[in-house]
Amino acid sequence: MNDTSFENCIKCTVCTTACPVSRVNPGYPGPKQAGPDGERLRLKDGALYDEALKYCINCKRCEVACPSDVKIGDIIQRARAKYDTTRPSLRNFVLSHTDLMGSVSTPFAPIVNTATSLKPVRQLLDAALKIDHRRTLPKYSFGTFRRWYRSVAAQQAQYKDQVAFFHGCFVNYNHPQLGKDLIKVLNAMGTGVQLLSKEKCCGVPLIANGFTDKARKQAITNVESIREAVGVKGIPVIATSSTCTFALRDEYPEVLNVDNKGLRDHIELATRWLWRKLDEGKTLPLKPLPLKVVYHTPCHMEKMGWTLYTLELLRNIPGLELTVLDSQCCGIAGTYGFKKENYPTSQAIGAPLFRQIEESGADLVVTDCETCKWQIEMSTSLRCEHPITLLAQALA
């Protein structure tokens, strides 16, 4: 990103109007002041860095709204990485090192899940680490997706058409069933699924919590693996997570300065890739699924402009009654909503969405983002699933 791109700002403040945090937290100066205006000051003197930038949730809604295409969110994230001299806390280490925590927790998932659901344990985490006791903590799977995949790797290799799956931390450590659902859907379309030779967390939690150098190292590892899949094997890379997809495509070059040139156009969200294949003439044997569902658009999905592909894909399911929520950010913003100081802001941001869901009369909520799923299931009475899971359920 050009460090002088803030000069394109015309001071219209439409970004502040679109900002979920500005609406509920008066302590945040807003994206215009935190981004373009603040950058002018920071370039003169780094001591003018404002700690309030930590309230930015990196939702990118300011960038979607900006008529001058100023990369406001990127400016803020880069400023935090460059000027914030605060040493990351143990809490931020625990929340951001998802590969480490997942590797340690999955072998003991039943014990870990039981412990973290106990009120005394959550009170202890609140007091010791400032992880808010009101936040429901994600559950771990007993065994990883990558380990399970070994049992089907030979079978997947038999398909003529292949894709590489960037599964991300959520599928690997928390919800392997989503990865299994994707394989089921792709196999039904005549496509086999490979995994990248090496995969690390996409880096978004690390960026958000002050571990930018670690995020950059992991990004380099992922880019090398993606380059092997795309350049050597000649197959595309798809992901089920909207945030992982966005990071691989856009955050790597814009925030981490990791070159993904020649790869970006070969990295796609699974729903978009599937829609394109159906549009090209491929078919899926889908049976009726008589459900009333509402779709929540994740922030990074909004930024990529790919919501329509997921919606059109879901409309291929017979009997499915689909309504798109008039929703903004759900408020969790990855690790942001787990932090004690952010919990009230997180829930206030999501409150309009929660009301819409409760008043919808729907059977189910659908979204492409795993942390949105956690927030919705904690804050409403409905279950939330990924679009791929609905497709898998509808397969005849």
UniProtKB/Swiss-Prot annotation:
It is found in: Cell inner membrane. Residues 2-29, 45-76 form the 4Fe-4S ferredoxin-type domain. GO terms for biological process: anaerobic respiration; electron transport chain; glycerol catabolic process; glycerol-3-phosphate catabolic process. Signal peptide: none annotated. [4Fe-4S] cluster 1 binds at C9, C12, C15, C66. Pathway: Polyol metabolism; glycerol degradation via glycerol kinase pathway; glycerone phosphate from sn-glycerol 3-phosphate (anaerobic route): step 1/1. Pfam families: CCG, Fer4_8. [4Fe-4S] cluster 2 binds at C19, C56, C59, C62. GO terms for cellular component: glycerol-3-phosphate dehydrogenase (FAD) complex; plasma membrane. Keywords: 4Fe-4S, Cell inner membrane, Cell membrane, Electron transport, Iron, Iron-sulfur, Membrane, Metal-binding, Repeat, Transport. The keyword Translocase does not apply. SUPFAM superfamilies: alpha-helical ferredoxin. It is a peripheral membrane protein. One of its GO terms (molecular function) is metal ion binding. NCBIfam families: glycerol3P_GlpC, PRK11168.1. Electron transfer protein; may also function as the membrane anchor for the GlpAB dimer. Composed of a catalytic GlpA/B dimer and of GlpC. PANTHER family: ANAEROBIC GLYCEROL-3-PHOSPHATE DEHYDROGENASE SUBUNIT C, GLYCOLATE OXIDASE IRON-SULFUR SUBUNIT. This is Anaerobic glycerol-3-phosphate dehydrogenase subunit C. The gene is glpC.
